[in-house]
Amino acid sequence: MSIPGLEHWLETAQGRYVREWESASMDNAIADVFGFNALQLGLPQCDFLRASRIPLRQKAAEAGTVDVLCELAALPFASHSTDLVVLPHALEFSADAHQILREVERILIPEGHLIILGFNPISLWGLRNRFDRSGSFPWHGAYLSLTRLKDWLKLLGFEVDRGIPGCHVPPCDQEAWLKRWHFMETAGGRWWGFPGGIYLLHAIKRTHAMRLITPNWRKNAVGSKALRPVAQKEGHGR
């Protein structure tokens, strides 16, 4: 899956602004996640595993310079083999976002971590996404709301650990305007009453323990003994 316009956008003032927030937020999110295998799916131009303490860190995507070239909806990794999966903007630019999540659930170990970066449709960025007809990145994506994404994750057995909003500055194209509106980033959504244009969602794959019901042999033994016929003593008449 090659995303048209992505390379150019990453080098714009807007792209650099988003990358800066996402990189810092991801560094904090994965710093205390431990294990043996970490995987970044998509957006190989950015290293979102740079702060991970996990020894084996790989990038996988459908195009670009990566460790593994593959379809994100059919991952070539064994089930229950990965401790951490990072999904930076892979869902909103995929034709089968739900299948990607199913594959992620399959390869994650129980209690494994999933961290998603996405554009928020309920924001100023989402408003531009709705009305921008240029077809350029990132305005042509199918943004996923947090409510919908949480529902999908719940159905797959994930528990949302935390969500972090970011990029409260309006989606201006010029760096001068991004700097002029930067005071909104500092205040965040606490003062302005609307969420940020980007979210980071951290979820954990939960495996609920099954209760194994075994036969109560003691009870059955007592029951069978109680039902056992007792030999009758026969009296002898004189």
Predicted regions and their residues:
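C-terminal lobe and adjacent flexible extensions of AdoMet/dcAdoMet transferase-like proteins
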Residues: 183-238
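Conserved class I S-adenosyl-L-methionine
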Residues: 113-143
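A short SAM/SAH-binding and catalytic strip from SAM-dependent methyltransferases
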Residues: 83-98
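Short alpha-helix
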Residues: 131, 140-163
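Conserved catalytic loop of SAM-dependent methyltransferase domains
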Residues: 160-185, 194-195
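A short glycine-rich, Lys/Arg-flanked "PGG" loop and its adjoining helix->strand segment in the class I
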Residues: 98-113
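Class I SAM-dependent methyltransferase SAM/SAH-binding core
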Residues: 24, 28-75
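A short acidic, Gly/Pro-enriched loop at the edge of an enzyme's catalytic core
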Residues: 73-85
